[in-house]
Curated annotation (Swiss-Prot):
This is Uncharacterized protein E423R. GO terms for cellular component: virion component. It is found in: Virion. Belongs to the asfivirus E423R family. Its main location: virion. Induction: Expressed in the late phase of the viral replicative cycle. Keywords: Late protein, Virion.
Amino acid sequence: MLWRNEITEFMDQLSKYSQEILKTFKQLRPSEYKQYNEFLTQVTSLLQKTPEKIPELVDHIFNYLDNVEKICELLVNASSIIISSKIREQVKHGMSFSYKADLDSLADVLSQKQYVLMNLSKNIAAQYFNTCLKQGKSRLDLKAASVFYNSRPRTASSAELYRKMLYAYGSLQEINYYTEKARNKTLDVEESDSMAIIERTARHNLSLMHPLEAMGLTFGATNTDADPEDLKNKTVINLTLPQATESITYHLKSLMQLKKVSTASGLNTNILKAFDNIISTPVKKNKMASKLAPGMDVVFTSDNGKTFFTKNILSKNMLAGPKERVFAYNNLINNLNNSCFIQNHTDFLKQQDSWPFYDAHNFTNKFLMQPIFSGQTRPRLQGAMEAAHVETHLTAFLQSIQPSRPQDPSVLASPKLSALILN
């Protein structure tokens, strides 16, 4: 089994590297050494109960994907500890020049192999789905798939598999229905409740979320590695955008709308597939320099987030409630990001490890990410993302597809953005 071979090869490489530094590592960093061993112990336990053969039954596949994803995550965590630059510098003290180079070479190999691991569970999900198709199954029991997906750990790979199942075997009504079930599970809503209670609970839970959190995305900021020369007169952080583990919940609807855009406008199917990749593919977590400084307000909120406007068109729009605010904000951010992506589609295919954004030097215009929700319950994220001439490229893209039935722009921050979202 290929995925098992990849893990075995990675563990062998990790063992080879650790033998070179283990004694010094153990003495200098006892707490990290302990954590490193704990990760490997958990890997051993998970491998023992994860068979090589991919299960055929849908009620087993989601647990299986969860196990593989945990194994890969644990190995990445363990290797990240042991190959960190600080630990390497401490260990290399007193080594000869050639020996230091060999150690760095081993660390680089491990670093590269980490990204292979991050795709393994996704590849298993794709293999499982392709097997179902090849077996000639004209229809899958979506009800059972929904139960198993919503009752087990949700991972990026299981979300991708579930989405593919819905599109391959479900009608439009079934896609909507089972997407709502996933949404209710995410928002902790009991299906037995009345619709009024469900709606009230969902709105309350959404109101406590940052809009990006409602999309299933979270930001993490760390200190920068940037060259001091680049930091003059500005504050810079590294911003990481991890893949959403709940991507099925909020992105299926977007994909359905994009399919409508494709049908109405003849949008290239490869670009449509690329949208899908942005939404559902877990790959390298790219770091992007981000300035924490005032800039052009793409979205600005006042009166506790009840209204918003954009300076470039000086429009002001009422937002009825938290769900509507999330909807407007999601579409604004998604469309801005997608416009950058499409402009660089060819380059992206050549450099997929830069998902979902290119490095900061490829971006020129600032996009201030200001939360729609105010108050003390959620921190305000004010990361200014550099976007590759967002407004210019987005306008050109919208003119090229010319969809026929744009949604009411009153729920979006700009009429230009509404053209991507169809009823």
